[in-house]
């Protein structure tokens, strides 16, 4: 058995889960998420717990067992607490500004970058150099933060660019010059 897959998922109060024809829908105070569950995995629900088991010991069933449990747990956590990822912008003249549902980034290029936010994602900009990406879907929050970071990733010499708040950049020494 998968160590992660055999752990039960606790359903908090205020969360409703419905499972029909391999479609799982989780409704909570922060929103609604739905996902198609892979074949080879069975979901059993009680009043306040969900358990995931696999149908057989095939390679696909074994690999889907722990993954399915983790995805369902992330859905439950997302609709109750939500997820957030913090980004920092470093560099002279680098800044971010939020206009409606468009994030306007000035990252040292000859043109500003206008990034349209996907549905279900909220962004907060603090002091024009800190970006907080929030949402209920963990995958979408992470993907949106990665797209914003990819516009100008941190460079190793001066550390300029967009980086995750908890990311450390390994700095390189510059040219030493002739002596």
From Swiss-Prot:
For molecular function, the Gene Ontology terms on record are: rRNA binding; structural constituent of ribosome
Q: Transcription regulation as a keyword? A: no
Annotated S-S bridges = none
Q: Does the keyword rRNA-binding apply?
A: yes
Keyword list, A-Z: Ribonucleoprotein, Ribosomal protein, RNA-binding, rRNA-binding
Protein function: This protein binds to the 23S rRNA, and is important in its secondary structure. It is located near the subunit interface in the base of the L7/L12 stalk, and near the tRNA binding site of the peptidyltransferase center.
Subunit description: Part of the 50S ribosomal subunit.
Record-given protein name? Large ribosomal subunit protein uL6
């Amino acid at each position: 058995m998968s160590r992660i897959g055999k752990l039960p998922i606790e359903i908090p109060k205020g969360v409703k889960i419905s499972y029909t024809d391999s479609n799982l829908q989780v409704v909570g105070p922060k929103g609604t998420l739905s996902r198609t569950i892979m074949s080879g995995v069975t979901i059993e629900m009680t009043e306040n717990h969900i358990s995931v088991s696999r149908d057989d010991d095939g390679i696909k069933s074994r690999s889907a067992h722990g993954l399915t449990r983790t995805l369902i747990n992330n859905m439950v956590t997302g609709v109750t607490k939500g997820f957030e990822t913090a980004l920092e912008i470093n560099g002279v003249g680098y800044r971010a500004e939020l206009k409606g549902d468009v994030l306007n980034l000035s990252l040292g290029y000859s043109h500003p970058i206008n990034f349209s936010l996907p549905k279900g994602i909220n962004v907060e900009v603090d002091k024009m150099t800190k970006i907080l990406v929030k949402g209920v879907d963990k995958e979408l929050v992470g993907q949106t933060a990665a797209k914003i970071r990819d516009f100008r990733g941190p460079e190793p010499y001066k550390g300029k660019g967009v980086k995750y708040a908890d990311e450390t950049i390994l700095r390189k020494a510059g040219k030493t010059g002739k002596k």
